[in-house]
Amino acid sequence: MLSERRLEVLRAIVQDYVGTEEPVGSKALTERHRLGVSPATVRNDMAVLEDEGFIAQPHTSAGRIPTDKGYRLFVDKLAGVKPLSSPERRAIQNFMDGAVDLDDVVGRTVRLLAQLTRQVAVVQYPSLTRSTVRHVELLALAPARLMLVLITDTGRVEQRMIDCPAPFGEASLADLRARLNSRVVGRRFADVPQLVQELPESFDSEDRGTVSTVLSTLLETLVEETEERLMIGGTSNLTRFGHDFPVMIRPVLEALEEQVVLLKLLGEATDSGMTVRIGHENAHEGLNSTSVVAVGYGSGDEAVAKLGVVGPTRMDYPGTMGAVRAVARYVGQILAES
């Protein structure tokens, strides 16, 4: 167990290295921080930190830099989440308030996260498997042709054309619309099949074929749209950190091009709290020199998707965690109000 003083030395090393991009020496630490001890004592503390794997000495420098283990201890024990300033919060709100639909919300969120953190931003679209139904609309386009419009609690809109086996009157259409909404509004998509399975039997025999066709189209829409989607932005930010990657930046870029890799990264994040994965904690080899900060977002208490950033392990963790958390909250508010 590290003493409080050595934890403070580690905190100072992380802060200085993140801020200066240069390995940190004992003399610089005592000059920049009020550690209350001599450079010789700090050197001894740094030797202990190095022996225990929290810092390391690059072969080109006499200073020390944090290891993945050091960053992990910093995040778990020493780093608080840095709140955004009032101007930053107002800027976020003004930028996000202009969104007109879900695609625009996701696109703006990606750009905002990338600008705030100067990292690569990744935003997952709300998953229909976690969403609930806000409304189902049925519109008559012709006597035997309908349009089904499905609206989710996250503002997602899906449209399908339906060719009916027989003409379907306005009264029957209004009846089906009302009965369908009474059963499924506010319910999770996973529950919908069971909720509507007996609905055709409650209609006259001449309408049952059309009702069954409408329900089949609705359920097929749920299956088709369960594929996860995401948006990525700010990849060019990585070019500013070329020296942070031990070999080359290409493996990182290649990993970021694989949607399956990114979906797995976000999938490993918890729904409720902040998830920070550092260096080799990331299973994908191409991301072993990066850190991932992610959190769930949603229109209520339950997360419907996740968002986060990917950057070098030499990251401003308090500031990044604060930005990711704040943006997630604003997106959740927009979805709830939309």
Swiss-Prot record:
Cytoplasm found in the keyword field: no
Membrane-spanning intervals of the chain: none
Calcium found in the keyword field: no
Keywords: Repressor, Stress response, Transcription, Transcription regulation
GO biological process: negative regulation of DNA-templated transcription
Molecular-function annotations in GO: DNA binding
Function: Negative regulator of class I heat shock genes (grpE-dnaK-dnaJ and groELS operons). Prevents heat-shock induction of these operons.
Family stated for the protein in its record: Belongs to the HrcA family.
Protein name per UniProt: Heat-inducible transcription repressor HrcA
Protein species of origin: Streptomyces griseus subsp. griseus (strain JCM 4626 / CBS 651.72 / NBRC 13350 / KCC S-0626 / ISP 5235)
